[in-house]
């Protein structure tokens, strides 16, 4: 593959000089302006996410062993030193080599050269670029500021691989910077309180994938989960006893800043606010504050309260952006309140959306008076909305594009709702720009990026990690890497590697299912239950809520809570089934397909007695039987295909109808190998 740039040469590895730093920045600027696209095979050889903007492969590899040493040069501060320590901690966990002890004593072979400081409060659009040169004998990471260093260190960690002779990193030269400046993850601590340790380890995962905005949502109808010193009844009466102290919030903000992550708070208003009214009923629109979900936007009491509250929270959160929500506001409480209706008539406010716009205008001014920029969901966008308000879109790329055409900056979340159990591929193909041909260059700049959203309506702190990871890595790549990086097969191959890497950061997504299955079964190693769990998924989108009744206190301890949103086994089997049905499969793929189908057919006999032992697993009995029957059909289809036998047309049709019934949810689960078996059946010949 032709590349447009050359290696920087040996001078890049010489002792640090300012001229070297300037030279790297200049070269990096031109290189990053014209990124080199790696083919899928080259992407796979790196095994990392996100794919960097520009990569040049070299010769050999850099060995990681007990002699490893890393030195900081140029600008230095305590944050860089902590970053070096975290880097060594992760590298030590991956290799098993106690590098955190040795690295301070060993001669350095890894040089981190930082040009200057970052902003005291991290800013939107702050430079995150870096230049990483890895050779067999030396590594040099150069960046204009600590943010770039943080990103480059994560790239190196992802490049570490085990070989027949030890741990090593391929010789490459990388020039990299993000495509979008806003690359976020929303964690909803409003529906359910999310403990600080869970928040922190997900910030570690964000650092690994170069995400840079933690959108922290604190309140909803179900609870108010942050301490207010000005209005203590908010947390005392509205939290159920679970809330973050302001000291804990400051601790998380500092933890995030160390990792190059901004923290943007969200306080959703004027709706989703029932929990506010438990302590402060005068704010409510409805007759019964305990049943009301909308703030009264016509009362002076409301704005006096919110001015003080927003001032308190704006002082607590240093980021320049403040999210005021504004979504899903049902105007029925305003319409049924005579006093509010009289206010609307007196002020020529025609309907609920217009009244919300009146409220939004006042809130935006309160936020701006605290020198913050308001962020809001799609609903806050009205013809008279101030142009500096940032729109977060749950409606989709076209809605975001229209906002950009009207002069607004925006962030996309539609397509990135990771709580809805969609596949990594579905998220991966959603681009914040949508169809970019409909936007001018200036309008494209207004699309700031996107956010994965982890709503906690039916997610607990126990299973949150396997709902967020590893699929969010696919979204992180979409937001960092070039638009043309879209090969789904390559993404999945790299996602497998990245998923394992995330374990070294303390994330628990790979362990959660097994632990929950052990509890469900009462067995220390319920192998047959794991076989079933490997090929089922929770239903997608909102179907799960239609099949099972959830409340704020529903125990999330069933199979649909335990299994990840996407079955790797089913996806891999589907790829093999496609190749078999098209006549392109290798003998090894035929063998693997037969081995899987045999395992699934025979698993039911071992699993049924286990399922009967526990009230948490009894409802899985028909799912297990279904898997056995579907697998038996698959084995017959393999025999027919291999032996070129014909199948009676009527029999095949009845078999397909059975498979279509089997594909429907049972026990709030989807049997994900059914479409693949149907593909095999449809590939057989009929008489």
Where are these regions (language model features)?
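Feature activates predominantly on carbohydrate-active enzymes
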Residues: 121-323, 337, 362, 366, ...
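N-terminal secretory signal peptides that target proteins for export/translocation
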Residues: 1-20
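Contiguous, structured surface segment used for ligand recognition
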Residues: 41-180, 479-482, 486-488, 496-501, ...
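Short, internal active-site loops enriched in acidic
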Residues: 116-118, 269-270, 327-331, 380-382
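N-terminal leader/propeptide and maturation segments of large enzyme subunits in energy/redox metabolism
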Residues: 327-343, 348
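Bacterial N-terminal signal peptides
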Residues: 21-34
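Sec/Tat signal peptide C-region and signal peptidase I cleavage site
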Residues: 36-40
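Substrate-binding groove of N-acetylhexosamine-processing glycoside hydrolases
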Residues: 48-51, 56-58, 63-66, 81, ...
């Amino acid at each position: 593959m032709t590349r447009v740039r050359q290696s920087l040469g040996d001078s890049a590895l010489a002792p640090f000089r300012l001229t070297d730093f300037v030279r790297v920045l200049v070269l990096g600027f031109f290189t990053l302006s014209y990124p080199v696209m790696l083919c899928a095979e080259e992407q796979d050889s790196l095994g990392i996410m996100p794919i960097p903007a520009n990569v040049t492969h070299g010769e050999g590899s850099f060995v990681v062993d007990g002699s490893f040493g890393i030195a900081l040069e140029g600008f230095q501060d305590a944050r860089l030193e902590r970053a070096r320590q975290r880097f060594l901690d992760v590298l030590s966990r991956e290799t098993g080599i106690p590098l955190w002890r040795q690295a301070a004593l060993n001669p350095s072979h890894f040089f981190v050269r930082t040009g200057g400081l970052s902003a005291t409060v991290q800013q939107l659009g702050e430079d995150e670029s870096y230049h990483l040169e890895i050779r067999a004998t030396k590594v040099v990471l150069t960046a204009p500021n600590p943010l770039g260093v943080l990103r480059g260190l994560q790239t190196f960690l992802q490049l570490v691989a085990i070989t027949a002779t030890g741990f090593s990193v391929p010789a490459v030269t990388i020039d990299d910077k993000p495509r979008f400046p806003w690359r976020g993850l929303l964690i909803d601590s409003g529906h359910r309180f999310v403990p600080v340790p869970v928040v922190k380890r997900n910030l570690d995962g964000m650092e690994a994938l170069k995400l840079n905005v933690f959108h922290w949502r604190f309140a909803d109808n179900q609870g108010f989960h942050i301490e207010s010193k000005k209005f203590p009844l908010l947390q005392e009466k509205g939290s159920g006893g679970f809330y973050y102290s302001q000291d804990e919030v400051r601790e998380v903000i500092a933890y995030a800043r160390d990792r190059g992550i901004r923290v943007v708070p969200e306080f959703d208003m004027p709706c989703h606010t029932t929990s506010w009214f438990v302590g402060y009923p005068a704010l409510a629109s409805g007759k019964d504050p305990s049943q009301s979900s909308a703030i009264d936007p016509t009362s002076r009491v409301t704005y006096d309260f919110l001015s003080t509250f927003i001032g308190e929270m704006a002082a607590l959160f240093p980021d320049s952006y403040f999210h005021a929500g504004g979504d899903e506001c049902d105007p029925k409480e305003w319409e049924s309140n005579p006093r509010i209706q009289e206010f609307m008539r007196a002020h020529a406010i025609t309907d609920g959306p217009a009244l919300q716009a009146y409220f939004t205008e006042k809130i935006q001014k309160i936020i701006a008076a605290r020198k913050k920029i308001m962020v809001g969901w799609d609903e806050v966008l009205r013809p008279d909305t101030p142009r500096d308000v940032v729109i977060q879109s749950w409606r989709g790329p076209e809605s975001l594009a229209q906002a950009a055409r009207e002069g607004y900056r925006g962030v996309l979340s539609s397509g990135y709702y990771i709580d809805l159990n969609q596949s990594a591929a579905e998220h991966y193909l959603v681009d914040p720009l949508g169809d970019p041909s409909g936007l001018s260059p200036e309008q494209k700049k207004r699309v700031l990026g996107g956010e994965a959203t982890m709503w906690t309506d039916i997610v607990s702190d126990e299973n949150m990690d396997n709902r967020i990871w590893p699929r969010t890595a696919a979204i992180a790549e979409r937001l960092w890497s070039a638009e043309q990086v879209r090969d789904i097969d390559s993404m999945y191959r790299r996602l497998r590697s990245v998923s394992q890497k995330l374990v070294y950061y303390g994330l628990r997504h790979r362990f959660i299912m097994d632990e929950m299955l052990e509890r469900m079964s009462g067995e220390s190693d319920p192998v047959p239950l794991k076989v079933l769990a490997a090929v089922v998924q929770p239903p997608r989108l909102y179907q799960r809520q239609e099949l099972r009744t959830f409340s704020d206190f529903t125990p999330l301890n069933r199979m649909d809570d335990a299994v990840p949103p996407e079955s790797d086994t089913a996806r891999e089997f589907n790829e093999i089934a496609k190749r078999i049905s098209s006549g392109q499969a290798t003998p090894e793929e035929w063998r693997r397909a037969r081995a899987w189908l045999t395992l699934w057919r025979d698993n039911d006999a071992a699993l049924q007695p286990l399922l009967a032992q526990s009230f948490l697993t009894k409802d899985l009995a028909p799912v297990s039987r279904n898997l056995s029957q579907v697998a038996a059909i698959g084995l017959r289809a393999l025999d027919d295909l291999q032996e070129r036998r014909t199948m009676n047309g009527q029999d095949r049709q009845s078999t397909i109808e059975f498979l279509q019934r089997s594909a429907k949810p049972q026990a709030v689960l989807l049997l994900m190998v059914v479409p693949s078996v149907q593909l095999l059946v449809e590939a057989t010949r009929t008489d």
